[in-house]
Amino acid sequence: MALKKFNPTTPSRRQMTMPTFEEVTTNAPEKSLLVSLKKTGGRNAQGKITVRHHGGGAKRKYRIIDFKRNKDGIPAKVATVEYDPNRSAYIALVVYADGEKRYILAPVGLKVGDTVVSGPEADIKPGNALQLKHMPVGTFVHNIELQAGKGGQMVRSAGTSAQLMAKEGNYATLRLPSGEMRYVRIECKATVGTVSNTTHEIVNIGKAGRKRHMGWRPTVRGSVMNPCDHPHGGGEGRSPIGRPSPVTPWGKPALGYKTRKNKKYSDRFIIKRRNAK
C-alpha cells in the first residue's frame, strides 16, 4: 500500500504519485464476470446533461461484484487480487468449493490462497461476511447492508471501515467513516475488515491528462462565462460576481448548501449527524 513517486521531468511529474499496486496479482480479469459499459458523456435518455464535465476516458468493462455474500457456509479460496477501474478499492476473485467464481471487495490483508466464508459460523477475520448480530462489539466492518438480503450499500470505498459500537434489541449501532452514528437492523450483513487500497486518498493526480483518462473534462469557472450561461458571468475584464455569496449555474447557493430533506424517512436511524459538534 505504498505510493510511487516520479522523477521531476516536468512540473506535473514532480507532484504526481501513484499506487505501487503491490497487492495486485494479475491484470487479466475473469471474462465470465465482465459486462460492457456504454459511455454516456454525462447525458440521460433525453440527451440532456445530468452530470457536468463527463466525457471521454479510457474504455472500461464492468466487473460484477458480489455485494450480497449469500453463499452461506461454503468456503471460497482467493484466486487473485485485481485492480478495478470502476472503483477505488481492489477486488478479489474467489472460487467457491462448488466451483462458482465471484468477485468481492478485497479487504486489507487478504492474500491469494486465503479462505473466506459467509454465514453465522464464520470467524471474525478479514473477508468473512456475517450478520451484525453474530459480530462482537468493536469489530471493524465494511460493505454494510441497509436492508437484509439487499446487498452491501455502505462503506465500500478504498480505505474505509465502520465500527460496531453497540447491539441493542433489533438494532446495531455503527460509527461510519464520516463520524455519523447510525442504527442498522441487526439481521443485516457486513464484511469484516477495512477496504483495501488505504493510500488512495493521498494520491496526487498531478496532471490534467490523467484526469481525462478517468473520464473527467475541464471545469469552466462561472466568472469567465457570459451572463446567459452563469449568474457570475458578464462584466468587463475580471469583474466581481456582484452577489453576496457564490451560486451554482442554476442560482442556488454554492459552498455547502444543504440539500437533504428535513423529513427524510431514515432520519429516525441517525443518532448523530456527521457534522454534529
Swiss-Prot record:
InterPro entries: NA-bd_OB-fold, Rib_uL2_dom2, Ribosomal_uL2, Ribosomal_uL2_bac/org-type, Ribosomal_uL2_C, Ribosomal_uL2_CS, Ribosomal_uL2_dom3, Ribosomal_uL2_RNA-bd_dom. Keywords: Ribonucleoprotein, Ribosomal protein, RNA-binding, rRNA-binding. It comes from the Bacteria. Pfam families: Ribosomal_L2, Ribosomal_L2_C. The keyword Flavoprotein does not apply. Residues 222-258 are annotated as: Disordered. GO terms for molecular function: rRNA binding; structural constituent of ribosome; transferase activity. Part of the 50S ribosomal subunit. Forms a bridge to the 30S subunit in the 70S ribosome. Belongs to the universal ribosomal protein uL2 family. One of the primary rRNA binding proteins. Required for association of the 30S and 50S subunits to form the 70S ribosome, for tRNA binding and peptide bond formation. It has been suggested to have peptidyltransferase activity; this is somewhat controversial. Makes several contacts with the 16S rRNA in the 70S ribosome. This is Large ribosomal subunit protein uL2. It comes from Clostridium perfringens (strain 13 / Type A). The gene is rplB.
